[in-house]
Amino acid sequence: MKKREKIMEYVFLLAAVISIVAVALICIFLFANGIPAMKKIGFAEFLTGTKWKPGNNKFGIFPMILGSIYVTGGALIIGVPVGVLTSVFMARFCPEGLYKLLKPVVNLLAGIPSIVYGFFGLVVLVPFIREHFKNSNGQSILCASILLGIMILPTIIGASEPTIRAVEQSYYEGALALGATHERSVFTVVVPAANSGILAAVILGVGRALGETMAVMMVVGNQPRVPNSILQGVRTLTTNIVMEMGYATDLHREALIATGVVLFAFILIINLCFSAIKRSGKE
């Protein structure tokens, strides 16, 4: 028995080491290729330049950074209220029979491939926006934000619903004993008690939205420009890499890898925030 436990211990250790090595290799690849490219282009020019014209050796990714921020921000404006309120409903208001139906639906949303979401956006959302907004061809920040807002719902609901459900029942019962209604007890006592978990769920949603590529590429327009309206098309960091990596060479290829470094930095900051919030929640 001890021998079997020892073998399993080594298996788990090997799995952990493989995971760490994989992340380390990715980091080495990104930074070894990306940082030299930033030096060649110029850090300020690369991060704040507004022109992306590889044929003229202009590699400014500021429009793509703005595009990623606008699309992600729009997705949060749409997805966070819906996701959090759905989590509250499922944890504290939902009848058991409806919960058994609603939970698999949320899980199914999480399992739908990105390309299917993108096809839905291209066939349904883009024509809808084109028809109702005369100044847009449909492929825009607004369309991508709506689509991403739907896509991050399973992430937000899946992470925040258990947190709300895990709040001690004594909090809720104490509020009822003081004369509060069921709704008031939930929204003034239970939800604030779960705020660290809900915020962590939102941060996970940000990471999901920021890293999404295929669905966004199909509906966002992909113009590398600084937008003046949510009805205009933009290009995000991820779509820029996917669209051009297949034919890029030399400095152009290195600039795309450097774009990956910037994206990696964004995701790293988000994960650090998530870890900090989890620690503060435990304390």
Model-predicted regions and their roles:
Residues K3-K6, Y10, A32-A75, P95-E96, ...:
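Periplasmic/extracellular loop-to-transmembrane helix junction in inner-membrane transport proteins
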Residues A159-S160, I164, H182-M218:
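Transmembrane alpha-helices
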Residues V216-L263:
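Interhelical loop and adjacent transmembrane-helix boundary motif
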Residues N107-L148:
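Generic hydrophobic transmembrane alpha-helix motif, especially the helices
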